[in-house]
């Protein structure tokens, strides 16, 4: 038996590429893999300038090439970027010459579908958009009614699925609970995220494959404990630790700064972030910058997002669908230590670094902080983090190393209050500021 259905944010239906009007370009600054089927199709093109250009622009993968080298999961070929790190098949107007001359059917799969992201869990499609596209980031983040969930129809016989996952009815129930948690504004967003963490712990305590009876009881018990305030994790015990937050943001951003291609748009955001937290010749230590980070949050970030609560909610929902949270990678990419709690830690890493960068950018622009700054920050940071195949593992391992995995660590990373919080405990005495690691050299895209 299989169940077909769709979890579809409204924005996946609304997206339309704006072409040469776009302030960025998806034809550069990263690897563009070419599948074997696309390559073979290119070989059928008649001789001419386009065929010559395509042949000169494709680099076949050497033996042992991996996804992180830009050749994609298939490991067959990729576009050989030019000296400006842009696709040489792009026209002077910024448009794809393959698309314009022979049509979209000749595009490699990544070029044909980007920024749409398709994820399948037991036959249920989960559609999202890659926020590395500026127009996608706009329609995902800025629409107050951005998503809707379409329940699957009755089960039908047909396909079978070999994924090491529970049956489809359990998956749909878990997906529904997860999305309802994120969108429930009866609780502040940091508490909603911790609710997700508690749920992940409870799912991991179930027998393997999350049997339907046990999983249904787990979800019912979870809903009840949230409703009556008897959740196993004491939200009131969470300390506010802006120093731990800033330290983690700097380390996470610096981690990818060493591995990813940094675009000029992202450099602008990093420069604004540094300005917003008060980085300068006489302020370079973590201790000296924490006060600026806290001020940026309390005076500019928090008031803005209190007026626009849907922005971070939409970011989380899109990330949940894009990353198949809490189910994790598909079978091909699933590792032996997969767990819902591990997926939660990775989700917190995504959210923490994005939120931390936005806090600094808000501090730089102060009262002028706007949705345009949000879109640029999220889009350019997503281009750096979300498309790097090593980020989930590196980010998870970093938070484990810092002791910020699981619920207590997540709580320290995501809770900020201007007043009424518990006294800050002395978790660490680090005097090292990692901002110099973030002084990237921009690639010219």
Give the location of each predicted region.
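Low-complexity, highly charged intrinsically disordered N-terminal segments
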Residues: 9, 25, 29-57
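Hydrophobic, aromatic-lined core segments that form the binding pocket/scaffold
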Residues: 188-445
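Short cysteine/histidine-rich zinc-coordinating motifs and their immediately flanking basic loops
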Residues: 32-41, 108-109, 122-127, 144-148
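Charged, amphipathic alpha-helical linkers/stalks
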Residues: 135-224
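Short, charged low-complexity linear segments at domain edges
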Residues: 1-11, 52-96, 104-109, 113
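Conserved aromatic-histidine-acidic binding/catalytic patches
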Residues: 30, 99-103, 121, 162-166, ...
């Amino acid at each position: 038996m299989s169940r077909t259905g769709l979890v579809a944010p409204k924005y996946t239906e609304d997206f339309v590429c704006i072409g040469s009007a776009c302030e960025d370009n998806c034809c550069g600054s990263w690897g563009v893999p070419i599948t074997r089927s696309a390559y073979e199709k290119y070989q059928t093109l008649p001789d001419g300038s386009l065929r010559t250009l395509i042949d000169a622009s494709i680099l076949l993968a050497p033996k042992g090439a991996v996804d992180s080298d830009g050749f994609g999961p298939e490991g067959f070929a990729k576009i050989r970027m030019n000296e400006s790190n842009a696709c040489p098949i792009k026209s002077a107007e910024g448009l794809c010459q393959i698309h314009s001359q022979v049509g979209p059917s000749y595009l490699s799969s990544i070029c044909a579908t980007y920024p749409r992201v398709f994820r399948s869990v037991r036959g249920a499609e989960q559609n999202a958009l890659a926020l590395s596209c500026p127009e996608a980031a706009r329609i995902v983040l800025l629409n107050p009614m951005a998503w809707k969930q379409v329940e699957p129809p009755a089960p039908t016989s047909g396909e079978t699925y070999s994924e090491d996952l529970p049956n489809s009815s359990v998956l749909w129930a878990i997906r529904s609970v997860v999305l309802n948690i994120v969108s429930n504004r009866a609780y502040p967003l940091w508490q909603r995220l911790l609710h997700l963490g508690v749920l992940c712990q409870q799912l991991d305590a179930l027998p393997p494959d999350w049997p339907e009876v046990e999983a249904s009881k787990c979800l019912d018990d979870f809903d009840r404990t949230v409703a009556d305030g008897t959740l196993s994790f004491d939200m009131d015990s969470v300390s506010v630790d802006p120093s731990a937050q800033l330290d983690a943001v700097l380390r996470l951003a610096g981690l990818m700064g060493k591995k990813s291609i940094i675009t000029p748009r992202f450099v602008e955001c990093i420069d604004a972030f540094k300005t917003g937290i008060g980085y300068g010749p006489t302020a370079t230590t973590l201790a000296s910058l924490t006060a600026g980070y806290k001020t940026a949050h309390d005076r500019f970030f928090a008031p803005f997002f209190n007026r626009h609560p849907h922005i971070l909610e939409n970011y989380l929902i899109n990330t949940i669908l894009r990353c198949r949270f809490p189910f994790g990678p598909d079978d091909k990419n699933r590792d032996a230590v997969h767990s819902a709690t591990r997926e939660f830690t990775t989700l917190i890493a995504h959210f923490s670094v994005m939120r931390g960068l936005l806090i600094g950018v808000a501090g730089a622009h102060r009262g002028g902080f706007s949705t345009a700054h949000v879109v640029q920050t999220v889009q350019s940071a997503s281009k750096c983090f979300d498309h790097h195949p090593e980020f989930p593992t590196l980010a998870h391992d970093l938070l484990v190393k810092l002791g910020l995995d699981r619920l207590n660590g997540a709580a320290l990373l995501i809770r900020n209050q201007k007043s009424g919080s518990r006294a800050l405990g002395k978790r660490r005495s680090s005097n090292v500021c990692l901002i110099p690691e973030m002084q990237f050299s921009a690639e010219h895209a």
